[in-house]
Amino acid sequence: MKKIDVKILDPRVGKEFPLPTYATSGSAGLDLRACLNDAVELAPGDTTLVPTGLAIHIADPSLAAMMLPRSGLGHKHGIVLGNLVGLIDSDYQGQLMISVWNRGQDSFTIQPGERIAQMIFVPVVQAEFNLVEDFDATDRGEGGFGHSGRQ
C-alpha cells in the first residue's frame, strides 16, 4: 500500500470525525467528511465549498487523487460535486475542499462529519506532444460522438 502524507488541519479529525479509511478490502475510494462547525442547508441549484479538515501531499508525480461523488447522495438526493470530478495534483499541499452541488428538487442539509465525497488515487502518465503533419490511418478515423451506434 502506498503511503501518502496527510496533515490534520482541524483537531476534530481523528477524534469526532474519523480519518478517511477504506470501508472494505475491495474499496477503491476513501470517504471524505464535511468538517463543518454547523449544518449547512443547500437549496436546489446551490453550490458550496465544504472543508475536509485535511491536507494531503501526494509528492509522487506518477500519482494523482480524484474526488468523486458518493453514489447514494447523488442518486437519492441529487448531491454531486460542483466540478463533477475534483483533481488533486501530486504537488498540491492545501486543504482538501469539496465543491458540493444540489442538483436535486429539494433542499439538502449537510451535517458536520457527514460523508459527502470519496477520494481515489490514480496513476498519471505525463505525455509529451509529438508534432506530426498527418496520423496513421485507423478504422475509426475522425468518427466522434455516437459513431459506433447505440446497439
From Swiss-Prot:
What is its cofactor? Answer: Mg(2+)
State where substrate binds. Answer: 70-72, 83, 87-89, 97
Disulfide cross-links = none
State the pathway, as annotated in the record: Pyrimidine metabolism; dUMP biosynthesis; dUMP from dCTP (dUTP route): step 2/2
InterPro entries per UniProt: dUTPase, dUTPase-like, dUTPase-like_sf, dUTPase_trimeric
| Catalytic activity reported | dUTP + H2O = dUMP + diphosphate + H(+)
Superkingdom in the source lineage: Bacteria
Name the Enzyme Commission number(s) assigned to this protein: 3.6.1.23
What's its top-level EC category? hydrolase
What GO terms in the biological process aspect are recorded for it? dUMP biosynthetic process; dUTP catabolic process
The record's annotation in SUPFAM superfamilies points to: dUTPase-like
Give UniProt keywords alphabetically.
Hydrolase, Magnesium, Metal-binding, Nucleotide metabolism
NCBIfam families per the record? dut, PRK00601.1
Task: Describe the task this protein carries out.
Answer: This enzyme is involved in nucleotide metabolism: it produces dUMP, the immediate precursor of thymidine nucleotides and it decreases the intracellular concentration of dUTP so that uracil cannot be incorporated into DNA.
Give the similarity note: Belongs to the dUTPase family.
Protein's UniProt name: Deoxyuridine 5'-triphosphate nucleotidohydrolase
Q: What is the lineage of its organism?
A: Bacteria, Pseudomonadati, Pseudomonadota, Gammaproteobacteria, Enterobacterales
- Gene symbol here is dut
